[in-house]
Amino acid sequence: MKKAVFVYSPDQLQYKFSDTHPFNHKRLTLTMDLLRNIGGLSDDDIVPARIATDEEIALAHDPQYIEIVKRAGHGELTPQQGEPYGIGTEDTPMFPNMHEASALLVGGTLQAVDYVMEGKAQHALNLGGGLHHGFRGRASGFCIYNDSSVAIKYIQE
């Protein structure tokens, strides 16, 4: 059993609202670089994130909302249509493939849960996760899906 694993995939950086938006996943690469530079992280410690399924995301989010997020990320939703769902706002603007990018962050958290629950690691960190402001049917505070809530429901299952 490993003492700790760090869940990371370069595609996690696709969770990006815009170049000027205050929420930026640069912290992922900066943290990885820092940990590597001080000898606290090796390639063997990195576990790839996986994409959460719609069924897993639906543990904490309405299926209708998941479909709205997919439509928004494929350019099939106007900001006015997305506004009741918290999508297309200043906090949570639409961006290409937003469902896929968000599902990868949720899947990264579930990957961390699996590593600990299956006894593969004592500790696991998905620094791309922790997006806890999302509601069951509404984005909020830069968070499309609430990976923390999904993980809790996932563990309970």
Regions found by a protein language model. Give the residues of each.
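HDAC/HDAC-like amidohydrolase catalytic core signature
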Residues: 1-157
